[in-house]
């Protein structure tokens, strides 16, 4: 030990870490119910009203703006980084399961976003993971056509080798969880008996890779999308195709029913279009939008069933609201620089207060509902693209941080005093103003013994 440093202690620096606690919202809801008060469908534009934010399901039809996940909260990544093709939340919403191209499962906390565990799940890339409706089982598929069934504690109970000849693209459970359907690049869909793991039917009809499939949440109806630009509806009892839809000029990327009612079907394609159909009216087209970039992944909001989110090839994330009347074919919210590369997967927490996104930039990013008044809401690098090394560690690490606004921000323009507070490198540092003691009533000369 150096005698010159003997007796000295190393100074430790602390930083704030964002944590999401949904229990406070449920406590507030319980208080309102107990005292017979009505839920407010809006939040006052005042920071003190942040404590009044309720759970997403408490707002009903009027909570679209409140429940939209627009605020970047945390960035997570494994030590050994790989592309992340699939995400899913555990049924209770406490953890996020992340699948990687090297066949691993990793678990992340859904509140503090800490890393919890990692395991080797498949010998090749894990391409899809799906929980049953009851949450008692999970099925995963890999790039070598293998399917595996897991318990909630990630104890593997069954392996189905060569379930498909090519990469498994999608898995979806029936409403009763007694069966599930899988699709693959081998041009077919297969229906499996969950209790014994045996194949029941093969749904043939597509002429190219089947990229997506989904089982209706209430009915015996399966939808699939393929590289042959076709959307097909199937009867799982007979295994026959009941209808074929045209209308796209390129590969169908994703087809998803509404998670609860199932009345609407959303479809995205590589022809840069997104469409929503009403299956109650012979698949009438209700919504259509065309973009300048490819849509890569799609996810419905679990609570607000008129809201869905798409991830794009350029790394942006866009929220759409079908109940919007002013501009029905425009996104209600756009996060232009959500990721540095193509977005590969989106997953909402079952409660609906957090959204996780994955990308080919090998990171997982968590997004939460915005607050009533947030001066830095649209001044994050995910909105203005002012990213430097480790930019995500510097976002609001100090709970009292006040950062200079850009033209992308929504705060008031800086005052004249802050304009004169420039650093040598041309940047400006803004410090919060402290009220003078002389402004307090009865304290004209300040407090004795204290200097400000």
Curated annotation (Swiss-Prot):
WD repeats lie at residues 79-118, 121-160, 163-202, 205-244, 247-287, 290-330, 338-377. InterPro entries: G-protein_beta_WD-40_rep, Pfs2-like, WD40/YVTN_repeat-like_dom_sf, WD40_repeat_dom_sf, WD40_rpt. GO terms for biological process: chromosome segregation; mRNA 3'-end processing. Residues 416-426 have a biased composition (Polar residues). Keywords: Chromosome partition, mRNA processing, Nucleus, Repeat, WD repeat. GO terms for cellular component: mRNA cleavage and polyadenylation specificity factor complex. Pfam families: WD40. Residues 409-452 are annotated as: Disordered. PROSITE patterns: WD_REPEATS_2, WD_REPEATS_REGION. Its main location: nucleus. It is found in: Nucleus. SUPFAM superfamilies: WD40 repeat-like. Residues 443-452 have a biased composition (Gly residues). Required for 3'-end cleavage and polyadenylation of pre-mRNAs. Also involved in chromosome segregation where it has a role in chromosome attachment to the mitotic spindle. This is Polyadenylation factor subunit 2. It comes from Kluyveromyces lactis (strain ATCC 8585 / CBS 2359 / DSM 70799 / NBRC 1267 / NRRL Y-1140 / WM37).
